[in-house]
Amino acid sequence: MITVKNIRKAFKDLVVLDGIDLEVKRGEVVAIIGPSGSGKSTLLRCLNLLERPDQGLIEIGEAKLNAEKFTRKEAHRLRQQTAMVFQNYNLFKNKTALQNITEALIVAQHKPRDEAKRIGMEILKQVGLEHKADSYPITMSGGQQQRIGIARALAVNPHAILLDEPTSALDPELVTGVLQVIKSIAEKQTTMIIVTHEMAFAKEVADQVIFMADGHIIEQGTPEELFDHPKNERTKRFIKQVGEPAELI
């Protein structure tokens, strides 16, 4: 489904990703945790070329790309395999919730407007916001805007959804609603890679958890393996510092 081999990314002299290898199976949910500056978000952005890796191989679905040399067509095909959910929502302020969802369906996938609207309304219902179809982002809470961002990603039916700290910009009382939407999507066997600082959420929802630090994958395993029985000392220190994951409400 997703295979990443020897991905490296540096910003001038600062190495952010150093030889990252990763495999994600179809229908699997992978949570990436770690301290700030560990390269988590950069890894996600490299997967859909929002950041161009300096080297390495990326394979998502039927799209393959060599980071050192690729064509515009190869880049376009790789980007089509994923949809991104950003921490700051990235909605079009001048478009309604429904229009934000249907934009990519009409412009990128060339679907008829009636079909795009039907898909958009189905997805809005899935995230519990069908009553907000004609509302603009300015009239919605941060949690509602993020759910629209998730709906937009779902609508294009990607091979995988990449979520970059989807709750980090939300007020605490809005976090649970967004996490519950993501959990419901995970239960439908949607392939997802989630960068998160919500440890309880990662433990409950993920099939695999990856701990990153200093541009490396330090340890990975099932939630039980990584949170309850970490092997690496760096992982143990991190888990101790952030606290044991509580149960997701």
From Swiss-Prot:
Alphabetical keyword list: Amino-acid transport, ATP-binding, Cell membrane, Membrane, Nucleotide-binding, Translocase, Transport
EC number: 7.4.2.-
Residues binding ATP: 34-41
Alphabetized Pfam families for the sequence: ABC_tran
Enzyme's top EC category: translocase
Induction conditions: More strongly expressed in the presence of methionine than in the presence of sulfate.
GO MF terms held by the record: ABC-type amino acid transporter activity; ATP binding; ATP hydrolysis activity
Location relative to the cell: Cell membrane
Keyword Translocase: yes
Domain of life: Bacteria
Function: Probably part of the ABC transporter complex YxeMNO that could be involved in amino-acid import. May transport S-methylcysteine. Responsible for energy coupling to the transport system.
Similarity comment text for this entry: Belongs to the ABC transporter superfamily.
PANTHER family for the chain: AMINO ACID IMPORT ATP-BINDING PROTEIN, L-CYSTINE IMPORT ATP-BINDING PROTEIN TCYN
Oligomeric form and interacting partners: The complex is composed of two ATP-binding proteins (YxeO), two transmembrane proteins (YxeN) and a solute-binding protein (YxeM).
UniProt protein name: Probable amino-acid import ATP-binding protein YxeO
Gene name of the encoded protein: yxeO
